[in-house]
Amino acid sequence: MGKDTIANIITYIRNADMNKKGMVQLPFTNITEKIVKILLREGFVENIRKHRENNKYFLVLTLRYRRNRKESSKNFLNLKRISTPGLRIYYNYQQIPRILGGMGIVILSTSRGIMTDREARLEKIGGEVLCYIW
């Protein structure tokens, strides 16, 4: 049984969000860094910083919460892993689904790198569907 780094990222973020923790520490990989930068650009994450501890690198994320007068509510509604190591899911640019009518995002791994569904449609390229976030 191998490692699924993308599922681990999703699980770390989902668990921290459910426990209302403001910060998450993820192991650093190139894929992790690219996915987290997409989350920052789309507004799901407030801040990212690279942290070194015992010759190992980590990404420290600050999650974004909406501020209410009574209590702060979470911003992440749902994260779902689609393509797994045992079952890869590929779409061309016309088949890429729109999540909640465009309010959510699909993260794809394409021949030009990891990108969102909007970027893939603009460049007219498809790829492996990594996860849905809405």
UniProtKB/Swiss-Prot annotation:
GO terms for biological process: translation. One of the primary rRNA binding proteins, it binds directly to 16S rRNA central domain where it helps coordinate assembly of the platform of the 30S subunit. One of its GO terms (cellular component) is ribosome. InterPro entries: Ribosomal_uS8, Ribosomal_uS8_CS, Ribosomal_uS8_sf. Keywords: Chloroplast, Plastid, Ribonucleoprotein, Ribosomal protein, RNA-binding, rRNA-binding. HAMAP family: Ribosomal_uS8_B (MF_01302_B). Belongs to the universal ribosomal protein uS8 family. Its main location: plastid. The gene is rps8. This is Small ribosomal subunit protein uS8c. NCBIfam families: PRK00136.1. One of its GO terms (molecular function) is structural constituent of ribosome. Pfam families: Ribosomal_S8.
